[in-house]
């Protein structure tokens, strides 16, 4: 188990009926969240640069929210949020596990940024949504080449 579980972009913008990801992914993400103590779960929400700050972002329907540790980002990598970086550093974090969406975009960028920040990084594919499976082979190759621990299989 990593020091922290980062749940990336599991929000209604991406995970809902009619979207690329739906209930099956939410159930898998919830199963993973349940394996961590609540104080070790961090949620990352994406806010597009054009969105108003006073518009509250909504988690995916039925997502298990066990922590008030919620950080927003407006770029692909969650490490563009200095508050997240300060929180992780201030808590002596050594290892991070990632789940969420999309494996080729925000999860990918966050994983690679975490490696550059010198964290031990793991990804549980059973709780990662990937819209483009073919492109994901390149992502996996890159993660392996950077020493990321990859476990589980995509849904």
Predicted regions and their residues:
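A short glycine-rich beta-strand->turn/loop micro-motif centered on a GG-aromatic cluster
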Residues: 97-100, 118-133
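Histidine-anchored nucleotide/phosphate-binding helix
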Residues: 28-36, 105-116
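Short, surface-exposed alpha-helical segments at coil->helix boundaries
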Residues: 53-57, 108, 137-140
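Structural recognition of alpha->loop->beta junctions
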Residues: 62-71, 131-155
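Active-site acidic carboxylates
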Residues: 1-75, 85-86, 90-94, 148-149
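S-adenosyl-L-methionine/SAH cofactor-binding core of RNA-modifying enzymes
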Residues: 77-81
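Short beta->alpha linker loops
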Residues: 75, 102, 154-155
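Short, glycine-rich nucleotide/cofactor-binding loops
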Residues: 18-22, 99-104
């Amino acid at each position: 188990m990593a020091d922290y579980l980062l749940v990336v972009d599991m929000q209604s913008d991406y995970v809902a009926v009619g979207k690329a990801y739906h209930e099956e992914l939410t159930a898998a993400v919830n199963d993973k969240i349940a394996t961590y103590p609540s104080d070790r779960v961090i949620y990352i929400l994406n806010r597009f640069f054009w969105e108003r700050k006073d518009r509250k972002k909504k988690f995916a329907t039925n997502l298990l929210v066990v922590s008030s540790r919620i950080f927003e980002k407006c770029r692909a990598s969650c490490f563009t949020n200095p508050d997240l970086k300060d929180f992780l550093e201030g808590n002596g974090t050594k290892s991070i596990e990632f789940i969420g969406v999309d494996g080729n975009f925000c999860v990918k960028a966050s994983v690679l940024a975490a490696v550059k920040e010198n964290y031990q990084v793991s990804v549980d594919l059973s709780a990662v949504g990937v819209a483009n499976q073919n492109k994901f082979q390149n992502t996996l190759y890159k993660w392996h080449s950077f020493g990321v621990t990859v476990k589980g299989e995509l849904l």
